[in-house]
Structure formats: structure tokens, C-alpha cells
Swiss-Prot record:
Leading EC class: transferase
Positions bound to Zn(2+): C234, C237, C253, C256
Taxonomic path: Eukaryota, Viridiplantae, Streptophyta, Embryophyta, Tracheophyta
Gene3D superfamilies to which the protein is assigned, alphabetical: 2-enoyl-CoA Hydratase, Chain A, domain 1
Protein name: Acetyl-coenzyme A carboxylase carboxyl transferase subunit beta, chloroplastic
Domain of life (superkingdom): Eukaryota
Any Pfam family the entry gives: Carboxyl_trans
Length: 497
């Protein structure tokens, strides 16, 4: 990727040339012809810019002017870098990359001498010394008069260029003591020839320091909200992941590898063989048993809104299926439904699943993702902990069957204190948040700071809280081997319905 440090246009009658200075170029030459492609200067890359443009006495070129029209700004700054100076003679490398939504500003002095040499050669050329300034309709005093310093000239050039191309505020790079804050407005959003939407970048420039801080404007939020259905933002690196491809990547961030939350339906699809899933108790819903009073939103209305949002009736899906041909009983909690909280319906569905697995001698998997007991159901939600634990005791101790608990992020509260930690084999996902009381609750209750990472899966694994940390990719294979090790084998092909 070649980056142009400074771009200029020189005009000869009706012909316009675009030329650039690049750090990687041995000589300076024209890049493209924006109007006429037959010109020999453009088609001869071996000619030096001083011979092809400055040195020919028959050529008449005006001073450095602006490059392209505002309508071409999207193409021009799609991936360009150029050098600017502030009033303190501090140089900055400004890099635009609109396609990847990058805007970078860095100090860079390595190219300064080359840039100065270029303009000094132009200003001190014999052509400039012999011609009359008054005859030039495009005469720019900032370019030629010795009373203006190089600093003022470069400030003026960049200020004028940026203002004409991307609507820069008049105070930027002007060196004025009355203005410390400057704003660059990039008009980069357009839709099918309609009026373009503006995406604002707010840049604070302190004339007494060389540090620049990029701020986001309020319009960024509007654009994010408009296209949020297309992307999923990583909780760890804040990178954007295209939602269409995220499912095929098992909801793992492409940038940092962080494990994003998965819906219960996606987890069922990940673990269960296609066409073998048989859900249980789908129509079981909560009826607000204690008539919980809420000043904000009634409990029933909240349940209804989550049902519409997720397409589920409750915070857990239960059923039977096959995992690599092995019949299993599976329960998957969904954090998107009221934080995966465990109410009376969640507890009843899990209890019925365990009882069914006990009667059918099926291995059991429960995928945990919950914030704990549901406060809107009071003590009834707490009783689910004892009810599920009692059913598991009969399943594990009396029937000697095999239960695997999978802890995902987050697993907290009553779920951690009951069936989450009762598995014969306890598996955790990488970097999962696993705790009884959350960090905020502990700090507010004990008035002590919880060490960073003390509730992460990797730390708890070394303390012996569970048996293994298994990534999502090999999870199905690991479970299949565990089941076969404990005497659960795939069905014969002839017996598969």
C-alpha cells in the first residue's frame, strides 16, 4: 500500500495534472491525469518532474492549487497520508483510511527535508525569478514572498486545501491564539446518489503541545444505531464482526479471539446432530406467581417483551437429540432472555429433563449461562436450586448416570451454587466469567476491591473448581469421547429413526 505524503495539482490551460510526493519514491513524478490521458508527460514515467514540468520554458504552470473537487473526496482520502506543520513547527503525519474507518495522526520528521526541498526548488527556480508576479492571476503571496516564513506557507496550504476538500473549520492549523479547538468534518456517507450523510470526526488541537486527541461526535452514534443489525461489537477489543459470518465462526471475535455470547439455538445447532433435536416443554411459561410489583415495567409485560425479542418462551431450552450418534438429554440456558435468570419455569423444565434422562438412561448435558435466581419470583426461584439438586442426586448417585456441566460466560448466583457445579465432569469455556457473587456486589458489600481476573475461568481452573477448559471448536468431539469412555456409544445405523 503506497501512501502519498502531499498531493498537489498543477494546471496548464485545460489540462490538470495530479502529482504527489511519496516517501518510497526515488524521484518525484506525476501520478495520474485527471482530464486528458494522451499527454506525453503522463505517459513517460521516466522523466524527472523538474524536467517535465518545471524545466520546460514553453510551459506555463501556475502555483500549487487544490487537487480535486469535493465530490471526489471519498476517492481521494480513501487511503492517503500527508505531512502538515503547526504554528510551532511541529510536523505531523495525517493518515486517512475511510474504508477501514481509520484516522491517524503521528509525528514524523523523516520526510520533512524532502518536502521542503521540493517547495524551495520550485520557489527559487529561474522560471519563478524571471516572471512577473503581477501578471499571474493565480499569484499566491504565501507561496512566493520571502516575508512569509515556510511555516506560515505550509500552514496556509494545508488549511486551504483541507477546508476546500473536507470542510475544515477555519481555525485549524492557523496558529491563532484565539482558537484551540478545531473540527474536521468528513462527508463520507452517501446512499445511492441521495444526499450524503456526514460522519463527524472531532479533533482537538492544542497549539502549545504536539499531542492530539481524537473525539467521536454524536453523529457516530446515529450511524452505529442505523447499521447495528449488521454487526456485532466485541466486548473485549470493541472490534466489529459481521453478523452474517459470525455464526459460522462460532461467535468468536475475528480480531482478538474473544468468545462472544451465543444464543441457546446456536449452541443446540453446535452440539446436536442435524435433524435429531426434539424439544421438551416448549409451551411452559411463567404466570407471575407472586404478582411481583414493579414501578417500571410489570413482570408479565417484561416476559412478553423478551419472548418477542428472542423467540423463546423462557430462559432455557430443553430436549433430546444425538451428539455424533449418541442419544443425549440437553438443556441450554439463554442469557439473552432476562439474563438467563432461573425462575420457577426454568427450574421445572430442567428438573423434568433430568427426570426424563433418568428414566431413559441418557447422558445429560446442561449448558449454563445465567445471572442467578430470578428476583421477580422471590423464594420460588430459590427453591429451584434445591429441586434441581435433588433430581440430580437421584440421577447421579442412585442411577449412576453421567452428567456434564458446561459453564459459559457468565455463570453466577444460584446456578453456580447448584447444578452448575454438580457435574461429574465440569467444563468451562475460555475466559468465561464464573462466580457466585458478582464483582460489583462483592465490592459494594465488603467495601474491598476484587482483583482483576480472579473470577475468570483460567484462574479458577488452577484453583481446582472444574476439570477442563475446552474451546468451542473441539467441544463436540470432546463430549463424544467422554460419553464413550463412560459407556455411551452411538446408535447402530439401522436403529436410527
Amino acid at each position: 500500500m503506497e501512501k502519498s505524503w502531499f498531493n498537489s495539482m498543477l494546471s496548464k490551460g485545460e489540462v490538470e495534472y495530479r502529482c504527489g510526493l511519496s516517501k518510497s519514491m526515488d524521484s518525484l513524478g506525476p501520478i495520474e491525469n485527471t482530464s486528458i490521458s494522451e499527454d506525453p508527460v503522463i505517459n513517460d514515467p521516466d522523466k524527472n518532474i523538474y524536467n517535465s514540468i518545471w524545466g520546460e520554458s514553453s510551459s506555463y504552470y501556475s502555483n500549487v492549487d487544490h487537487l480535486v473537487g469535493a465530490k471526489d473526496i471519498r476517492n481521494f482520502i480513501s487511503d492517503d497520508t500527508f505531512l502538515v506543520r503547526d504554528s510551532n513547527r511541529d510536523s505531523y503525519s495525517i493518515y486517512f483510511d475511510i474504508e477501514n474507518n481509520n484516522f491517524e495522526i503521528d509525528n514524523d520528521h523523516s520526510f520533512l527535508s524532502e518536502l521542503e526541498s521540493f517547495f524551495y526548488s520550485y520557489r527559487n527556480s529561474s522560471y519563478m525569478n524571471n516572471r512577473s508576479k503581477s501578471d499571474d492571476p493565480h499569484y499566491d503571496p504565501y507561496m512566493y514572498d520571502t516575508k512569509y516564513s515556510w511555516t506560515n506557507h505550509i500552514n496556509s496550504c494545508i488549511d486551504s486545501y483541507l477546508r476546500s476538500q473536507i470542510c475544515i473549520d477555519s481555525s485549524i492549523l492557523s496558529g491563532s491564539d484565539n482558537y484551540n479547538d478545531s473540527y474536521i468534518y468528513n462527508y463520507i456517507c452517501s446512499e445511492s446518489g441521495k444526499s450524503s450523510e456526514s460522519e463527524n470526526s472531532n479533533i482537538r488541537t492544542n497549539t502549545n503541545r504536539s499531542d492530539l486527541t481524537i473525539k467521536e461526535s454524536s453523529n457516530d452514534l446515529d450511524i452505529t444505531q442505523k447499521y447495528r443489525h449488521l454487526w456485532v461489537q466485541c466486548e473485549n477489543c470493541y472490534g466489529l464482526n459481521y453478523k452474517k459470518f459470525l455464526k459460522s465462526k462460532m461467535n468468536i471475535c475475528e480480531q482478538c479471539g474473544y468468545y462472544l455470547k451465543m444464543s441457546s439455538s446456536d449452541r443446540i445447532e453446535l452440539l446436536v446432530d442435524p435433524g435429531t433435536w426434539n424439544p421438551m416443554d416448549e409451551n411452559m411459561v411463567s404466570l407471575d406467581p407472586i404478582e411481583f410489583h414493579s414501578e417500571e415495567e410489570p413482570y408479565k409485560d417484561r416476559i412478553d417483551s423478551y419472548q418477542r425479542k428472542t423467540g423463546l418462551t423462557e430462559a432455557v431450552q430443553t430436549g433430546t437429540g444425538q451428539l455424533n450418534g449418541i442419544p443425549i438429554a440437553l438443556g441450554v440456558m439463554d442469557f439473552q432472555f432476562m439474563g438467563g435468570s432461573m425462575g420457577s419455569v426454568v427450574g421445572e423444565k430442567i428438573t423434568r429433563l433430568i427426570e426424563y434422562a433418568t428414566n431413559e438412561f441418557l447422558p445429560l448435558i446442561i449448558v449454563c449461562a445465567s445471572g442467578g435466581a430470578r428476583m421477580q419470583e422471590g423464594s420460588l426461584s430459590l427453591m429451584q436450586m434445591a429441586k434441581i439438586s435433588s433430581a440430580l442426586y437421584d440421577y447421579q448417585s442412585n442411577k449412576k448416570l453421567f452428567y456434564v456441566s458446561i459453564l459459559t460466560s457468565p455463570t453466577t448466583g444460584g446456578v453456580t451454587a447448584s447444578f452448575g457445579m454438580l457435574g461429574d465432569i465440569i467444563i468451562a469455556e475460555p475466559n468465561a466469567y464464573i462466580a457466585f457473587a458478582g464483582k460489583r456486589v462483592i465490592e459494594q458489600t465488603l467495601n474491598k476491591t476484587v482483583p482483576e481476573g480472579s473470577q475468570a475461568a483460567e484462574y479458577l481452573f488452577h484453583k481446582g473448581l472444574f476439570d477442563s477448559i475446552v474451546p468451542r471448536n473441539p467441544l463436540k468431539g470432546v463430549l463424544s469421547e467422554l460419553f464413550q469412555l463412560h459407556g455411551f456409544f452411538p446408535l447402530n445405523q439401522n436403529s436410527i429413526k
